[in-house]
Amino acid sequence: RDCLLSRGLGDVYKRQVDMSTGSLGQGLSAAVGMAIASKMDSAGCRVYCLLGDGEIDEGQIWEATMTASKYKLDNLCIILDNNGLQIDGKIEEVAGLTNIEGKFSNFGLKVINVDGHNIPNLIDAFDTAKQTKGVPTIIIAKTIKGKGVSFMEGKAEWHGKAPKQEEYEKAIEELRRGVE
């Protein structure tokens, strides 16, 4: 059961993941710091930061966004999982956040909208982000929370909740059927 599904939340025990954060929005601030350090060291590294749309109602996200724009961090790519749900329910009911694309664009980011379940479109979005110069990029990936798992799809109550063994097995089976 060594997968994200079995834990309910992310972890840092993967070589490609330098840190995992969450709903308080510290992840983007850390990513901005890493992107600045990479530029200062001429390391040529790209920094990727995955955000949930529930955490962008935190002020720290917008402070980090302003900083990324100010320093023209074109080595920073933010991916926003825009599924419309957070732990407390629907985004528009909890935070009232609207026009996400416009907000990030107004802060000076290159905005790329994509179907987050379409792998070829995601690859194209990452290629575009890599070629973008002078500004940070955000890929807004429109997704469905729990897509492909009948009892999880579109349900906020599965946020941060690990499934029981029988639920886990059913979820894995449904996901396998979906990719065959």
What are these regions (language model features)?
Residues 11-180:
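Glycine-rich ThDP/TPP pyrophosphate-binding loop and its adjacent helix/strand module
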Residues 2-13:
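Single conserved hydrophobic/aromatic residue that forms the stacking wall/gate
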